[in-house]
């Protein structure tokens, strides 16, 4: 990740360099756009767009980890994500990284057997699912509560 600019042929020195402020600024801008795309897709009830934003965020986080030499996506998280993707879901790390916490969204059209197979695969890999649900706030319109 070099700020989105092609710098030509990479040398060993280029690959070993420390990330610069431009690299991180590029990551932040791309992350901001990814969040905006996610929110827009949620507002439009566009599951394809939601899944695309989740996948894009994963790619950005993996790139940041590679750029900084930091483990963001552990082997366990990689297994969680790859098996979710193989079963029609979209997934990414959650939190600061390295802590084996991930978010998985599954297509509501997925079959029960696909979901059961996914959960069995996770169980064999010692991945534990937390059964969480989205909370819908009371009377919220455009991010402003009627109680305010």
Language-model regions: role of each:
Residues 100:
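Conserved glycine-rich beta-strand-loop-beta hairpin in the small C-terminal domain of fold type I
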Residues 1-92, 103-148:
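C-terminal nucleotide
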């Amino acid at each position: 990740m070099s700020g989105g600019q092609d710098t030509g042929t990479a040398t060993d020195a280029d690959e070993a360099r420390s990330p610069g402020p431009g690299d991180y600024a590029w990551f932040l801008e791309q992350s901001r756009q990814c969040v905006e795309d996610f929110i827009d897709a949620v507002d439009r009830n566009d599951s394809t767009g939601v899944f695309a934003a989740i996948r894009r965020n994963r790619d950005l986080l993996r790139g940041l980890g590679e750029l900084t030499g930091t483990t963001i996506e552990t082997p366990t998280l990689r297994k969680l994500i790859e098996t979710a993707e193989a079963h029609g879901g979209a997934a990414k790390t959650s939190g600061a990284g390295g802590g084996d916490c991930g978010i998985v969204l599954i297509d509501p059209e997925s079959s029960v057997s696909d979901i059961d197979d996914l959960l069995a695969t996770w169980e064999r890999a010692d991945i534990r699912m937390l059964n969480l649900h989205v909370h819908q706030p009371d009377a919220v319109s455009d991010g402003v509560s009627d109680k305010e």
